[in-house]
């Protein structure tokens, strides 16, 4: 597809290419980048010049690291703002103690890491703290959104036809409801959804495709000029410290994880917008009060990070207003 695209639109040839995406794209983008790097000669002849990748709240790791292991810490940090009762939290803490994740993040999220992350023996799907906290949140707030945990009523569809409380996509969106759009861009006259109703990870599982953190992501980071991993702190689809744990469990460029803790302040319009850290061509950015969809809820930090990805600003500019 990419070779055909560059052949059809020759003005793209020779321009810098960056791959960026959110959520599911965290599994796909590293494999796409790896394919491009592995076919460098062919792509160079076609004018394709990949410079790096950007993953936003991405699934580049499995659910155990991304969701389960940091779930109790997330619950402790946010249950009051989500109106979850102390009694419910006590029951959740007992469950976390039983399966061995009550203080997992505090024990194992180190800079530099002390070795590969252990998986508690008691961890199992039937005792999921992640799922239990999600149910408590829904009980406390019928409009609870795992995309943005402090969302409140009303809970309508957004312009893309996404009901963020149910994690389902619906056909009532601007693309389908405005018949003039599809002909303008030569799109087929069919119904489009903002997110597939199919389960792409199940499809990839059948193909025996592993999450890229275990396979191609380290090499992609090493070959790229810049790799950025962003995460919104109020996302419960994939947890911010799940991303941190995953990075600390990954080896690239001769070392495991970051050697220093992320502590640099991301500034936007003179205000703190999050934390960031860069080592060995990988940058992690944790965006304050941002959802799973950072650009939708925090467009100014998202735009500044896009400028950083494209090289329009340097890393030291992230701390400048």
Regions found by a protein language model. Name each.
Residues 1-321:
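Terminal and linker regions of secretory-pathway proteins
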